């Protein structure tokens, strides 16, 4: 679970994690603090100190969601690996259907488009830019998913090793790159409904939202370039 500057949500997340671990004794939860400067990482360490099957990794600098996810999966030995955003966008209730779906697919992604009104309350500009980015990414990269950006994705151990050995981006288009690599590696991809929690808030300003959208477009082109130059070549 990658987190960055989420000090106000630490208690809520820890309660959800503790409840999930009690419900699923086989569950192992790793919180990866991506260089927070508000004490998020230390607070997670304190709150989860006595909670079984949990671990907190502190990254000294902010390197992006992609790096945080890779670090969280680096030493994982479980047969099914799942990452979900640490800002409480999605509840732990998604873990069970994700786990079940991973018995049928190599990769399973959460899709907000499968939940009626899942984007309720989402600012119009954000919704429009998100839809536009998704369609642009799918068109340029030859993939077809109604929701590439939901921070809820699961992998079999074998699929995760194959994907993260090739994956390069650290943020912005990180999720799109993963799905592009799924197609390139011939991995099967399933989808489950991803319901956004009622307490989740979108913190990005309008200016940063537009800048991030432009950065995402740049990274989509970078994915195309890497593919064309053989950077993703199998066995490389």
Feature locations, PLM:
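Short, well-formed alpha-helical segments that are part of the catalytic scaffolds
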Residues: 6-20
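Donor nucleotide-sugar binding loop of glycosyltransferases
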Residues: 6-9, 36, 65, 91
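Acidic helix N-cap motif at the loop->helix transition within catalytic regions
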Residues: 8-12, 38-47
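Conserved donor nucleotide-binding strand/loop of the catalytic core
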Residues: 27-31, 41-75
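A conserved acidic beta->alpha catalytic loop
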Residues: 33-42, 88
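Acceptor/aglycone-binding surface of glycosyltransferases and processive sugar-polymer synthases
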Residues: 59-75, 80, 92-172, 199-218, ...
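Catalytic donor-sugar/metal-binding loop of nucleotide-sugar-dependent glycosyltransferases
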Residues: 143-144, 168-170, 179-197
């Amino acid at each position: 679970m990658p987190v960055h500057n989420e000090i106000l949500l630490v208690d809520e997340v820890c309660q959800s994690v503790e409840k999930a671990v009690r419900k699923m004794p086989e569950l192992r939860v790793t919180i990866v603090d991506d260089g927070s400067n508000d004490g998020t990482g230390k607070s997670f360490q304190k709150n989860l100190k006595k909670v079984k099957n949990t671990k907190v990794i502190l990254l000294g600098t902010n390197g992006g969601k992609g790096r945080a996810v890779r670090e969280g999966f680096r030493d994982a030995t479980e047969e099914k690996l799942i990452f979900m955003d640490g800002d409480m966008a999605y509840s732990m209730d998604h873990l069970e259907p994700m786990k079940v779906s991973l018995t049928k697919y190599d990769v399973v992604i959460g899709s907000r488009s499968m939940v009626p009104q899942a984007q309720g309350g989402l600012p119009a500009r954000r919704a429009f830019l998100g839809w536009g980015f998704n369609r642009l990414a799918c068109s340029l990269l030859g993939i077809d998913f109604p929701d590439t950006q939901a921070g809820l994705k699961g992998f079999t151990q074998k699929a995760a090793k194959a994907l993260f050995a090739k994956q390069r981006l650290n943020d912005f288009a990180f999720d799109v790159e993963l799905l592009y690599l799924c197609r390139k590696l011939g991995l099967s991809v399933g989808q489950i409904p991803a319901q956004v929690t009622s307490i989740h808030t979108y913190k990005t300003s309008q200016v940063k939202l537009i800048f991030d959208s432009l950065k995402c477009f740049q990274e989509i082109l970078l994915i195309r370039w890497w593919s064309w130059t053989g950077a993703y070549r199998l066995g490389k």
